[in-house]
Amino acid sequence: MKKEHKSLIRKDGFQTLLASLVCVLGGLIVGYLVLLIIEPSGAFEAIVAVMKSFLRFPGALKLKYFGQALVRTAPLLLCALSVLFAYKVGMFNIGAAGQYCAGACAALYAALAWNMPWYVCILLGMLAGALLGMLAGALRTLFNVNVVISGIMLNWITLYLTNLVLGTVKNPTSPYTKTLQSTTPGALIPSLGLEKLFNNEKSVTIAIPIAVLTAVLVWVVLNKTKFGYELKATGSNYNAAKYCGMKENQNIILTMVIAGALAGFGAGLLYLTGIEDWETTISSVPAMGFNGIAVAFLGGLSPIGSILSAFFIQYITTGGGNVDLQVYCSQISSLISALIIYLCAFVGFFKYFIQTRLRKADERKAAKAAQIQEGGEDK
């Protein structure tokens, strides 16, 4: 028999891509409308500045800011992997932000207080995130506590515990932790010459390829292993997985452990590059964990798709800082970036809309064919 080929619009990957592009365009349009309402005269220039991001700078500076964007893309990608990994088993890991805090706490404290090498600091950061993920998973399986509720509560608890712990290793003259470059340079992730590709930007390290390789590894685990199949089966139908003999509660806890470890890993990949220090007086949970949710959905809940979506989200976030502050207030860059980022989380909705339209078109086509056939039989 001749193999029937699907049209491009009916392929799942193309539908995800199309839905993602619609979300991105929608976010830019909404952002532009907000700028028009606030100050019409500078709206067009502002949205162009956001879209150009670091590309607006001349050659040498462009490479420098490109490198910094990649450095911040790495932890964003890991947070997205944390969210999508948990989502495969039916868990919405909103606690990725708290797990990220735990990872930052353990990694920085090990570096500044114990003078540990970078790889030990990263492992401790992963362990801290994993323990927090395990707690959320255990609450879900043992006491049926929704992971969204426990995740939100643990986010704030972890934030303030992190502030307390890292307050012991902060700079005496500022609210920030001591800089790794001047105190424990051995805790910095090595660059292996990668910084030369980005105008000697010192924060560019092997964290970038490590994050990409981690995404590939997660894809392999989810799609090419028995464990990944069991996770997706548990997420699709909890009772059916239980009936088939799968250890559904064990899978949920293990999934949350891995998700927490990924978020903690992301924190280590950011702070151990030395690109920024932890502010011990911060009163809001870092946005990195929440942005990971948008990245995961924009990437179609695919580890490979999340690589591209993580870079795009960071690209837009960087571009938000280019808005003219003489025309708009200082918060406008964060507002525009947030609008675009969170509208990107509607990929699933637009994908469902596309599939619904295609299904209705098929039903109309089938009904028309049936009418023609009935007419032929009557004759």
Q: What label would you give each PLM region?
A:
Residues 1-26, 236, 243-250, 320-379:
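Cytosolic-side transmembrane-helix boundaries in multi-pass membrane proteins
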Residues 2-78:
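Membrane-interfacial amphipathic/re-entrant helices at transmembrane-helix boundaries
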Residues 7-18, 87-94, 113-117, 123-184, ...:
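Short loop segments and helix-boundary regions at transmembrane helix junctions
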Residues 35-39, 53, 58-113, 126, ...:
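Single transmembrane alpha-helix segments in multi-pass membrane proteins
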Residues 147-149, 203-210, 252, 284-288, ...:
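Loop-to-transmembrane alpha-helix initiation sites
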Residues 155-224, 332:
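Transmembrane helix-bundle core of multi-pass membrane transporters
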Residues 198-278, 303-304:
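Helix-loop-helix "hairpin" substructures at the membrane interface of multi-pass membrane proteins
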Residues 263, 271-338:
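Transmembrane alpha-helical segments in multi-pass inner-membrane proteins
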